[in-house]
């Protein structure tokens, strides 16, 4: 994706290989700039690591904006043809192709460790990444590794938190940040944010959960600013009410997710978060409605059917 930032003009057309975060972010921007965008994703849905409902809603929004999206599409190769590139792929067992002025490969990155270590001081590696323990110490005592160099989320804020933990440990201080609670943000329009586990992931782990959801079309500020479809979803343990995850797709989602990062990191319950009053009109009111929905007290959503 670095090369896209060096371009002096907007291409007429762009094919993006991959349907992850980087892909949908660039697709959103370039489509708004008038570029014809095509996304090719090998898995059954875009944003495959996020909540299914988010993937489905974003796909509808992007297609509405003229972006072609092909899922379960296995790319076979890219060939130059005059002043354009032909991206060949297989979809539904049929060979197809997408022609565009440029092709962006957005399927992830590998750590660059070339020349990083001396020959006689190379730590244990696994698939190009440095192996560390829970304290981020490598197989070489006193040598630590954080961020994109190790396994885990390739995010700037995750790397910063890991670095802080290492320094605090070395200084003999109590660790101040829970590095296992990592917010994920997608800068599309509308924004997307997530932390903790989804409802499906909870089921896979055998955790009994309840889910509160608020559709943001009923939010006052969303109506004022004429926002597109969006929602806030909260996942909490069924018996204790402890919040274990949250997924948001709405305006300012990347700013509002912080409330749930704090909640998940501190094992806070739904009732504890409900104690806070939320100003009106704000997007943040949607959080209160989703929390109330978990408790059966939301007044701006359709009531759930009694079991």
Question: Which role fits each region the language model picked out?
Answer:
Residues 1-11, 98-170:
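FAD-site-proximal beta/loop scaffold in flavoenzymes
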Residues 2, 71-73, 213:
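Short loop/edge segments at beta-strand edges and connector loops
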Residues 5, 21-22, 53, 150:
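Residue-level detector of alpha-helix initiation sites
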Residues 8-50, 85, 155:
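Rossmann-like NAD(P)H-binding beta-loop-alpha module
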Residues 33-134, 197, 204-208, 217:
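A Rossmann-like FAD-binding core segment of flavoenzymes
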Residues 44-48, 72, 78, 175-191:
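Flexible, acidic loop-helix segments that line cofactor/substrate-binding pockets
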Residues 70, 124-126, 173-183, 207-212:
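A short alpha-helix-loop-beta-strand transition element characteristic
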Residues 171, 187-198, 203-307:
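Flexible, glycine-rich terminal cap/loop adjacent to redox cofactors
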């Amino acid at each position: 994706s670095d090369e896209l930032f060096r371009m002096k003009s907007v291409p007429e057309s762009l094919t993006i290989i991959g349907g992850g975060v980087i892909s949908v972010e660039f697709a959103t921007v370039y489509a708004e700039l008038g570029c014809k965008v095509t996304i090719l994703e090998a898995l059954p849905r875009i944003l495959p690591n996020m909540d299914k409902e988010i993937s489905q809603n974003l796909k509808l929004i992007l297609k509405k904006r003229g972006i072609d999206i092909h899922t379960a599409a296995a790319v076979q190769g890219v060939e130059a043809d005059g002043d354009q590139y032909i991206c060949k792929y297989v979809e539904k067992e049929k060979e197809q192709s997408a022609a565009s002025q440029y092709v962006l490969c957005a399927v992830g990155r590998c750590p660059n460790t070339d020349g990083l270590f001396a020959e006689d001081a190379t730590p244990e590696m696994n698939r190009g990444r440095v192996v560390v323990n829970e304290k981020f110490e490598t197989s070489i005592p006193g040598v630590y590794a954080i961020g994109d160099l190790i396994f885990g989320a390739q995010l700037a804020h995750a790397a910063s938190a890991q670095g802080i933990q290492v320094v605090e440990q070395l200084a003999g201080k109590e660790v101040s940040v829970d590095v296992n609670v990592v917010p994920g943000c997608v800068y599309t329009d509308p924004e997307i944010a997530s932390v903790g586990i989804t409802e499906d992931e909870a089921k896979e782990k055998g955790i009994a959960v309840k889910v509160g959801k608020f559709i943001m079309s009923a939010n006052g500020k969303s109506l004022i600013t004429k926002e597109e479809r969006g929602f806030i979803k909260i996942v909490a343990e069924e018996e204790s009410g402890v919040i274990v995850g949250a997924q948001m797709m709405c305006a300012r989602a990347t700013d509002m997710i912080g409330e749930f990062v704090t909640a998940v990191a501190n094992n806070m319950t739904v009732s504890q978060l409900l104690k806070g009053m939320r100003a009106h009109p704000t997007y943040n009111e949607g959080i209160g409605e989703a929390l109330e929905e978990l408790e059966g007290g939301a007044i701006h959503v359709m009531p759930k059917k009694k079991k």
